[in-house]
A protein has these predicted regions:
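Conserved glycine-rich cofactor-binding loop
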Residues: 17, 24-26
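Rossmann-fold scaffold of SDR-type NAD(P)-dependent oxidoreductases
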Residues: 21, 94-102, 118, 141
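Conserved glycine-rich Rossmann-like NAD(P)H-binding loop of the short-chain dehydrogenase/reductase
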Residues: 38-55
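The beta1-alpha1 cofactor-binding region of Rossmann-like NAD(H)/NADP(H)-dependent oxidoreductases
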Residues: 50-51, 71-83, 119
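A glycine-rich helix->loop->beta "capping" turn
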Residues: 63-66, 85-99, 186, 241
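Catalytic loop of short-chain dehydrogenase/reductase
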Residues: 102-108, 138-182, 194-198
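Catalytic Tyr-X3-Lys loop
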Residues: 108-126, 130, 136, 140
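C-terminal helical subdomain
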Residues: 183-191, 205-257
Length: 257
């Protein structure tokens, strides 16, 4: 039986390099941890919490892998280019790119921030990564059911701007699939329900007391951070699923796509 805390076989990613955006905490951090446990060299990306990122890096290095920590504002083109220049200098190439970072519920970031981060920045990161990605590499985009199904299934008002912008990002990335396939690069969308223990779930619960319990009752189970991160890690190595989409957990409450 597979250890749920070690979802990928030790050594299965030896010699590979993986970059996870927004990986100093939460789903991104656990995804990076699983890659390191499997032997991959890892790039930890963070926006403004360097000590937290460095602490994680020290933990991952105990697996015997190389870890690069790079701070970058993904909405800033120069910052993104600088990040990939560091990656190229350190590792030469990239085998796995996980587009995990997202946002839009933060206060004081402006009305367009959600779209800038969840759509525009995702494309910006992909474009900057392409010269380092080669035949056999994989790009994974992390989203939520509330965003993936936003066109057909309403969500909480507080989450609508995030959901719409993440769906816009997903659509924009899907338009790149033919180009990626021509280069031999796989693309997978991983969509999950509300994830217990995430900042987003906490903020939604604060705005809608009882929201998590209600959703858990409807779904039967809500994944926690580590469990969902394991699905993201598997999406980076498993065969490409139908429609390039890995749906995690219950989707019976959602209609269409």
């Amino acid at each position: 039986m597979t250890d749920p805390l070690i979802p990928l076989a030790p050594g299965s990613l030896s010699g590979k390099t993986a970059l996870v955006t927004g990986s100093s905490r939460g789903i991104g951090a656990d995804t990076a941890r699983y890659f390191a446990q499997a032997g991959a060299n890892v790039v930890i990306n963070y926006r403004n919490k360097a000590p937290r990122a460095e602490k994680l890096a020290a933990q991952l290095r105990e697996s015997g892998v190389e870890v690069l920590v790079v701070g970058a504002d993904l909405t800033d083109a120069e910052s993104v280019q600088a990040m990939f220049s560091e990656v190229e200098q350190a590792f030469g190439s990239l085998d796995i790119l996980v587009l995990n970072a997202s946002g839009g519920m933060e206060s004081g970031m402006g009305e367009e921030y959600a779209l800038r981060l969840n759509r525009d920045a995702q494309l910006q990161v992909l474009d900057a990564a392409l010269p380092l990605l080669s035949d056999g590499s994989r790009v994974v985009f992390v989203t939520s059911h509330q965003a993936h199904f936003i066109r057909t299934t309403p969500t909480m008002p507080e989450y609508v701007p995030v959901a719409l912008s993440k769906r816009a990002g997903e659509d924009a990335l899907r338009e790149r699939i033919p180009e990626l396939e021509a280069r031999g690069i796989g693309f997978v969308v991983v969509s999950g329900d509300m994830i217990e223990g995430t900042i987003t779930a906490t903020l939604l619960e604060r705005a809608n007391p009882g929201a998590i319990a209600s959703r858990r009752e409807s779904a039967g189970k809500l994944y926690n951070v580590g469990e969902f991160a394991a699905e993201v890690a598997h999406a980076a190595v498993d065969p490409i699923p139908p429609a390039n989409t890995r749906l995690v957990g219950d989707t019976t409450s959602f209609e269409g796509e």
